[in-house]
C-alpha cells in the first residue's frame, strides 16, 4: 500500500512538471474528447450482446471499482469520505444527473434513432448549459461567446449531416431521449457548481459512479432487460467493457469533473462538440472509415466557434508568445502578469 501510494504521488508530480499549469486544462479537455470519442467503437461492439442499460451498469461498475480502489490507495480517510452536506448532495447530484439519467437516456435513445441525430441532439448540451447557468447561478454569456457556441453547433451538424427524414421518422422518441440526456448533464453540471462540495473531485467522482451504477442496475431490472452475466458473453464484449470502463469512464469522468470545477460547466461541456470529431478520427484510424470533405469542413467550423468562445485566452497566449520572441522570456512561465498586446 505504501509503495502504491508513493508511486501514485510520484506519477502525479511528474505529470505536473511535464505540462505547464496554464496548459493543463487544455490538455485535459483534448484528452477527454479523445477518451469519450474513441469509446463509440467499443460501445457498439458491446451492445451486440448486452442490453443498453445493463451495459451502462457494467461500465460504471468497472469505473467505480477502479477509481475507488485508486482513491483508497492514494488518499487518507479524511480525504475520500464525504464530510459536509454539500459533499453528500454533490455525490447524489452527480450520481443521478451526470451518471444515471445521462447514460440511461443516451443509451436507450441511441437504440431508436440514428447516430447522426443522436450526435446533434447530444450536441445541444453546451447550448442548454448556459440556460441553466443563467437560471441557477445568474451567469450570463457574452454575445460573442453565444455566437461561438452556435457556430460550433453548426459545425457538428455539418459533420453528422442529418437528413430531413431523420427528423420526422420513427426515431423521434429516441431523439427526445437523447435530448433529455443532454439536458441532464447540463443541469447536473450547473447544480454541482452551485452546491460547491468541499471534497476533492476524484473521490467525489468515484462515489458518484458507485451511486450511478446501482441506479442503472435498478433501472435495467425495472425495464425487464435480460440480466446477462459477463461470463456468458464473448471475449470481444468483455474487452469492450474494459476499454469503455477504464479509460473512457474511470479516467474520462475524473477529467470531466475536474474541468467542471476549474473552468465551469459551460466551457467544460463544450467537449460535446469535439466528441464527433474524435469519433470520426477513431473510425478512420481503427476501422478504415473515410473522412469526407464535409467532416473536414465541419471540423474547421467547430474550431472557429471555439476560437470565439476562448478568444481572450487565445489572445493572451499569442501575446505571451510574441513577448517571448522579442525578449526571450519563456512562454510557459506561469509567474507574472498577463502581458499586454497593444500592437
Task: Give the location of each predicted region.
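Hydrophobic/aromatic residues within transmembrane alpha-helices
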Residues: 46, 55, 59, 109, ...
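Hydrophobic transmembrane alpha-helices of multi-pass small-molecule transport proteins
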Residues: 2-3, 132, 141-164, 173, ...
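Structural signature of hydrophobic alpha-helical transmembrane segments
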Residues: 51-65, 108-127, 170-184, 234-249, ...
Amino acid at each position: 500500500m505504501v509503495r502504491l501510494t508513493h508511486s501514485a504521488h510520484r506519477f502525479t508530480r511528474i505529470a505536473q512538471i511535464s505540462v505547464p499549469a496554464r496548459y493543463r486544462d487544455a490538455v485535459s479537455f483534448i484528452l477527454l474528447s479523445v477518451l469519450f470519442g474513441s469509446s463509440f467503437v467499443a460501445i457498439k461492439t458491446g451492445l451486440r450482446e448486452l442490453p443498453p442499460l445493463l451495459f451502462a451498469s457494467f461500465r460504471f461498475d468497472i469505473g467505480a471499482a477502479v477509481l475507488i480502489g485508486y482513491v483508497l490507495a492514494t488518499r487518507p480517510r479524511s480525504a475520500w469520505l464525504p464530510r459536509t452536506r454539500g459533499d453528500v448532495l454533490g455525490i447524489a447530484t452527480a450520481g443521478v444527473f451526470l451518471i444515471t439519467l445521462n447514460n440511461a437516456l443516451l443509451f436507450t435513445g441511441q437504440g431508436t434513432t440514428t447516430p447522426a441525430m443522436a450526435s446533434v441532439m447530444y450536441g445541444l448540451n453546451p447550448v442548454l448549459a448556459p440556460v441553466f447557468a443563467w437560471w441557477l447561478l445568474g451567469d450570463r454569456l457574452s454575445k460573442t461567446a453565444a455566437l461561438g457556441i452556435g457556430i460550433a453547433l453548426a459545425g457538428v451538424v455539418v459533420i453528422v449531416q442529418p437528413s430531413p427524414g431523420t427528423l420526422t421518422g420513427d426515431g423521434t422518441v429516441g431523439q427526445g431521449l437523447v435530448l433529455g440526456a443532454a439536458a441532464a448533464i447540463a443541469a447536473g453540471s450547473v447544480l454541482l457548481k452551485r452546491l460547491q462540495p468541499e471534497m476533492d473531485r476524484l473521490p467525489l467522482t468515484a462515489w458518484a459512479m458507485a451511486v450511478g451504477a446501482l441506479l442503472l442496475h435498478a433501472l435495467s431490472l425495472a425495464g425487464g432487460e435480460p440480466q446477462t452475466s459477463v461470463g456468458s458473453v464473448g471475449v470481444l464484449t468483455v474487452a469492450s467493457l474494459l476499454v469503455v470502463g477504464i479509460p473512457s469512464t474511470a479516467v474520462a469522468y475524473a477529467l470531466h469533473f475536474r474541468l467542471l470545477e476549474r473552468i465551469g460547466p459551460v466551457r467544460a461541456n463544450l467537449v460535446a462538440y469535439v466528441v464527433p470529431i474524435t469519433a470520426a478520427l477513431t473510425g478512420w484510424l481503427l476501422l478504415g472509415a473515410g473522412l469526407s470533405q464535409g467532416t473536414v469542413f465541419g471540423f474547421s467550423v467547430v474550431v472557429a466557434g471555439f476560437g470565439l468562445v476562448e478568444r481572450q485566452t487565445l489572445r493572451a497566449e499569442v501575446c505571451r508568445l510574441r513577448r517571448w520572441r522579442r525578449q526571450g522570456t519563456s512562454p510557459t512561465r506561469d509567474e507574472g502578469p498577463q502581458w499586454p498586446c497593444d500592437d
